[in-house]
Curated annotation (Swiss-Prot):
Catalysed reaction equations from the record: tRNA(Trp) + L-tryptophan + ATP = L-tryptophyl-tRNA(Trp) + AMP + diphosphate + H(+)
PROSITE patterns xrefs: AA_TRNA_LIGASE_I
Protein keywords: Aminoacyl-tRNA synthetase, ATP-binding, Cytoplasm, Ligase, Nucleotide-binding, Protein biosynthesis
Keyword Ligase among UniProt keywords: yes
UniProt-listed Enzyme Commission number(s): 6.1.1.2
Originating organism: Arabidopsis thaliana
Sequence similarity: Belongs to the class-I aminoacyl-tRNA synthetase family.
Protein name, UniProt field: Tryptophan--tRNA ligase, cytoplasmic
Protein localization: Cytoplasm, Cytosol
Gene Ontology biological process terms, A to Z: post-embryonic development; reproductive structure development; tryptophanyl-tRNA aminoacylation
EC class of the enzyme, as a word: ligase
Predominant cellular place of this UniProt entry's protein: cytoplasm
Length: 402
C-alpha cells in the first residue's frame, strides 16, 4: 500500500503544476495548455468568438487575441450575447504586489485589459492584493502597502482612463459591503473544499485560508456600492492568466447560491522565462525576466545571453536545417509584442528555413522590447502620487459606460 502511495506521489511530482503560487511544466518540458483546459473545465477561445469581438467593437482584435495569447474562457460568449443586446458589463483584474518593478509578463493582463476597456467602453476595477503578498511572501504589512502604490504607478502608466477605472488596495478598501460578500462566500466553502482547490495543508497559517474570498468578491458588483448602486445583476469579465482559474472556479460555484451572476473569464497563457518554456517569467530570478526598469543595454545583454534559442549549433547546420521555432524564446516573445502580423510571419519563415540567423532575430527582439520598455518608462515617470490618489479614491464614476 505504501509503495502505491509513493508511486502516486512521484507521478504527481512529475506532472505539470499550475496554481496561483506555482507554475512548472512536467519534467522540464512545456506547459500543456490542452491538458489544462481539460483539467480546469474551461473552453478554448475559438475564431468565431474573436470574429464576434471584431464585429461588436468595430476594431481589429488585439494581437493577444489574434495570436492566442488569451486562449481560454468561461462564458465569454454570454458576455458578448449580453453586450449585443445592449447590456454592459464591468472588467476586473488584479496584481499581487511582491516586487518593486514589474516585468513584461506582469504587463500582459493590463495591456489586454486596457484594450477591452477601450473597445467595449466599460468600467474597470483593479485589485492590488497587498494582503496576499504579505501572507505568502512574508512581507510586512507596511512594505506590502508601499509596493502596492509603486505597482499602481506602473499600472496607471499602461494608459487607463481615470474616469472609468477604480484601483484599490485590499488593506485600504476591504470592509463594508465588500467584507459582507467575503463572509457570504466564506460560509459556502468548506475547509475540505478549500484544501482541495488550493492545496492548503495543516502547516499553513490560517491567514492563507481567509484569502480566497478576498479575490472572489470583486466579481460581485455589490462589493462596490459607490460604483454600481442598484446594479447587482451587472456581469463581470475577468482577464487573467490561467493560473488564477482556481479562485474563480470557487467563485463561480458559490455565486448562484448568493443570488449573483457567475463571473466570466478570459484567460492567457504564461509569458515564458528567457531560459525556456517550462514555467513563467519570475520576479525572483532577475535573469529570467525583462523588467520595465531595465536599460537598453540590460535588455540587449539579457536577450543575447539568456534567451533560449532554437537555432542550430553552427551556421552551416542552421542554413541546412533551420531553427526549431517550437522552443525558440525570441520568436515566442516576438509573437507577444511584434504588432505587425506580416513581419512576424516573414521572420518565422526565414528563420525556420535557415535563411535568417539567431543573432538577427535577437536583434529585432531587442529593438521591439527596448521601444516598449522606454515608452513605459516615460509614461511611468509622468505618474504622480496625486494621480495614484485619484485612481484609488472611493468615488462614483458617472461617465463609466460612455
Amino acid at each position: 500500500m505504501e509503495v502505491d502511495k509513493k508511486d502516486e506521489r512521484e507521478a504527481e511530482s512529475s506532472e505539470q503544476v499550475v496554481n496561483p503560487w506555482e507554475v512548472s511544466a512536467k519534467d522540464g518540458g512545456k506547459i500543456d495548455y490542452d491538458k489544462l483546459i481539460d483539467k480546469f473545465g474551461c473552453q478554448r477561445l475559438d475564431e468565431s468568438l474573436i470574429d464576434r469581438v471584431q464585429r461588436l467593437t468595430s476594431r481589429q482584435p488585439h494581437v493577444f487575441l489574434r495570436r492566442s495569447v488569451f486562449f481560454a474562457h468561461r462564458d465569454f460568449n454570454e458576455i458578448l450575447d449580453a453586450y449585443e443586446r445592449g447590456d454592459k458589463f464591468y472588467l476586473y483584474t488584479g496584481r499581487g504586489p511582491s516586487s518593486e518593478a514589474l516585468h513584461l509578463g506582469h504587463l500582459i493582463p493590463f495591456m489586454f485589459t486596457k484594450y477591452l476597456q477601450e473597445a467595449f467602453k466599460v468600467p474597470l476595477v483593479i485589485q492590488l492584493t497587498d494582503d496576499e503578498k504579505s501572507i505568502w511572501k512574508n512581507l510586512s504589512v507596511e512594505e506590502s502597502q508601499r509596493l502596492a502604490r509603486e505597482n499602481a504607478k506602473d499600472i496607471i502608466a499602461c494608459g487607463f482612463d481615470v474616469t472609468k477605472t477604480f484601483i484599490f488596495s485590499d488593506f485600504d478598501y476591504v470592509g463594508g459591503a465588500f467584507y459582507k460578500n467575503m463572509v457570504k462566500v466564506g460560509k459556502c466553502v468548506t475547509l475540505n473544499k478549500a484544501m482541495g482547490i488550493f492545496g492548503f495543508s495543516g502547516e499553513d497559517p490560517i491567514a492563507k485560508l481567509s484569502f480566497p474570498p478576498v479575490q472572489a468578491v470583486p466579481s460581485f458588483p455589490s462589493s462596490f456600492p459607490h460604483l454600481f448602486p442598484g446594479k447587482d445583476n451587472l456581469r463581470c469579465l475577468i482577464p487573467c492568466a490561467i493560473d488564477q482559474d482556481p479562485y474563480f472556479r470557487m467563485t463561480r460555484d458559490v455565486a448562484p447560491r448568493l443570488g449573483y451572476s457567475k463571473p466570466a473569464l478570459i484567460e492567457s497563457t504564461f509569458f515564458p522565462a528567457l531560459q525556456g518554456e517550462n514555467g513563467k517569467m519570475s520576479a525572483s530570478d532577475p535573469n529570467s525576466a525583462i523588467y520595465v526598469t531595465d536599460s537598453a543595454k540590460d535588455i540587449k545583454n539579457k536577450i543575447n545571453r539568456y534567451a533560449f534559442s532554437g537555432g542550430q549549433d553552427s551556421i552551416e547546420k542552421h542554413r541546412e536545417l533551420g531553427a526549431n521555432l517550437e522552443v525558440d524564446i525570441p520568436v515566442k516573445y516576438l509573437s507577444f509584442f511584434l504588432e505587425d502580423d506580416s513581419e512576424l510571419e516573414h521572420i518565422k519563415k526565414e528563420y525556420g528555413e535557415g535563411r535568417m540567423l539567431t543573432g538577427e532575430v535577437k536583434k529585432r527582439l531587442t529593438e521591439v522590447l527596448t521601444e516598449i520598455v522606454e515608452r513605459h518608462r516615460r509614461a511611468r515617470a509622468a505618474v504622480t502620487d496625486e494621480m495614484v490618489d485619484a485612481f484609488m479614491a472611493v468615488r462614483p464614476l458617472p461617465s463609466m459606460f460612455e
